[in-house]
């Protein structure tokens, strides 16, 4: 057992391009935000260690690094994930409609008992909102997964989203399943990607 942490959880952020996945990651891991974030900057993952119920949990949070623009993310990305956060943009109805497709990807590639969380991002853009909170909540409830609206821009519920996911995974794994000793093989893809403009509130 590594003395630095009790658990190591691999989390994934998936969803359509431009919904703010990278901004959520930067807000949670570094507490930073930028309007001019390049969607394909190629951040593979960030790490943040949290305390939960007296346990030290190391979260390894993976971003799609722009792959989602091609609608398919390689199956290896899902391998070994403990939790997957599906993100849509509350001002973009299509990104919400595509949540079902992302959930199908999870069913196809991720482990059967992986924890899921639905996140509606950009909640600060209240005047542009087109996806109703109640609609999304009912959909998430029907699937038995937690749901939160977040804003990476003003940090609303960002901490809560990742803490909720960590708590759900910890609950599923039980007290005897500390994964601190498991070392997932890290394969960092260094393929250069073409930057594309666009912010991600």
Curated annotation (Swiss-Prot):
It is a lipid-anchor. GTP binds at residues 17-23, 33-36, 39-40, 66, 121-122, 124, 151-153. Prenylated; by GGTase II, only after interaction of the substrate with Rab escort protein 1 (REP1). Rab-1B binds GTP and GDP and possesses intrinsic GTPase activity. It catalyses: GTP + H2O = GDP + phosphate + H(+). One of its GO terms (cellular component) is phagophore assembly site membrane. One of its GO terms (biological process) is Golgi organization. Interacts with MICAL1 and MICAL2. Interacts (in GTP-bound form) with MICALCL, MICAL1 and MILCAL3. Interacts with GDI1; the interaction requires the GDP-bound state. Interacts with CHM/REP1; the interaction requires the GDP-bound form and is necessary for prenylation by GGTase II. Interacts with RabGAP TBC1D20. Interacts (in GDP-bound form) with lipid phosphatase MTMR6 (via GRAM domain); the interaction regulates MTMR6 recruitment to the endoplasmic reticulum-Golgi intermediate compartment. Interacts (in GDP-bound form) with lipid phosphatase MTMR7. A motif (Switch 2) lies at residues 65-80. SUPFAM superfamilies: P-loop containing nucleoside triphosphate hydrolases (SSF52540). Residues 174-201 are annotated as: Disordered. The modification Cysteine methyl ester is found at residue 201. It is found in: Cytoplasm; Membrane; Preautophagosomal structure membrane; Cytoplasm, Perinuclear region. Belongs to the small GTPase superfamily. Rab family. A motif (Switch 1) lies at residues 30-45. The modification N-acetylmethionine is found at residue 1. Mg(2+) binds at residues 22, 40, 63. Residues 64-83 are annotated as: Switch 2 region. It comes from the Eukaryota. Its cofactor is Mg(2+). The small GTPases Rab are key regulators of intracellular membrane trafficking, from the formation of transport vesicles to their fusion with membranes. Rabs cycle between an inactive GDP-bound form and an active GTP-bound form that is able to recruit to membranes different set of downstream effectors directly responsible for vesicle formation, movement, tethering and fusion. Plays a role in the initial events of the autophagic vacuole development which take place at specialized regions of the endoplasmic reticulum. Keywords: Acetylation, Autophagy, Cytoplasm, GTP-binding, Hydrolase, Lipoprotein, Magnesium, Membrane, Metal-binding, Methylation, Nucleotide-binding, Phosphoprotein, Prenylation, Protein transport, Transport. This is Ras-related protein Rab-1B. GO terms for molecular function: G protein activity; GTP binding.
